[in-house]
Amino acid sequence: MNHLPMPTFGPLAGVRVVFSGIEIAGPFAGQMFAEWGAEVIWIENVAWADTIRVQPNYPQLSRRNLHALSLNIFKDEGREAFLKLMETTDIFIEASKGPAFARRGITDEVLWEHNPKLVIAHLSGFGQYGTEEYTNLPAYNTIAQAFSGYLIQNGDVDQPMPAFPYTADYFSGMTATTAALAALHKVRETGKGESIDIAMYEVMLRMGQYFMMDYFNGGEICPRMTKGKDPYYAGCGLYKCADGYIVMELVGITQINECFKDIGLAHILGTPEVPEGTQLIHRVECPYGPLVEEKLDAWLAAHTIADVQARFAELNIACAKVLTIPELEGNPQYVARESITQWQTMDGRTCKGPNIMPKFKNNPGKIWRGMPSHGMDTAAILKNIGYSEADIKELVGKGLAKVED
């Protein structure tokens, strides 16, 4: 396979990934591959560009490092070109409503006829099969959260709230990435392709597992948070200091002992309710739970964030200031690790945003390109798989492909 022009870098150099999907979930999987060195081709509708393009800034992050192909993959010669592309593809990711590709004639079996080693990842709200009531429904972040039991666990005691920004999309996209890589590893061992069925609600069901297990194995429903505090454990969650907010996790024998001395609760240490060796204080089951919260709230409110951080560092209590977005760039840890970076857009502007993560020591990721325009790489991609200038012109003339203006 001849690769498209791009630098060689990262742990996935030489892997070709193609994705078809809009907005966040499916494309996020493609974005991860692209930042780790894979050659990633982004398929867009010929007539209508990905709706993410209407956003002013986010697409410059979510579509960097990609090659843009505008092709009608379901019709006539456009379908033929797509299947030709699949012959040189390692991983194909599609995000749609249920088995939408199969309904339009592009089944796993059709794809494997053209490439028996292809890894196919189907990402949808409710999966590729199930009941007619759900399988073909559209789904976004909040739908997956609501249907999975994840949303009902978030929010405050007064009202459930979805977790933002777009948590289900990102978890599902990352699941597609990891599952596809696992499948690719096996394919290289066996030579046999794989198809992966990723239902967003099942991803969120698994991500919401912690408290659910108490219900599935005992019928206990965990309450939601109160003002950002852990529903089970005292000293864990969001707290207000004299000049802002911190989060903390009061976990550990020494940590509890020393913290209780600071906040005036040394007398309850070693009691039947807080016996020696206590590592966590249950806010409901422990009779002293409410008192711990009361004393801790008062102590924190009387101290600045800096003072609290310094003291908790001495006690080895995990805590962090709740940073505002403007505070991120100047934070010394962000600066030291270059967590925020800049890159050039295709029209020559400078864009700022999150850097590549995670950080590979020997084969680091790289930002080599901004978001391509609609159809920017169509001609180059089609030439790469054997199409002539005349062939491409014919596809464009029939409305089956779009090249950059």
Swiss-Prot record:
It comes from the Bacteria. The keyword Cytoplasm applies. The active site is at residue 169. GO terms for biological process: carnitine metabolic process. It catalyses: crotonobetainyl-CoA + (R)-carnitine = crotonobetaine + (R)-carnitinyl-CoA; 4-(trimethylamino)butanoyl-CoA + (R)-carnitine = (R)-carnitinyl-CoA + 4-(trimethylamino)butanoate. GO terms for molecular function: L-carnitine CoA-transferase activity. The keyword Transferase applies. Pathway: Amine and polyamine metabolism; carnitine metabolism. Its EC number is 2.8.3.21. SUPFAM superfamilies: CoA-transferase family III (CaiB/BaiF) (SSF89796). Keywords: Cytoplasm, Transferase. One of its GO terms (cellular component) is cytoplasm. Gene3D superfamilies: Crotonobetainyl-coa:carnitine coa-transferase, domain 1, formyl-coa transferase, domain 3. Homodimer. Belongs to the CoA-transferase III family. CaiB subfamily. This is L-carnitine CoA-transferase. The gene is caiB.
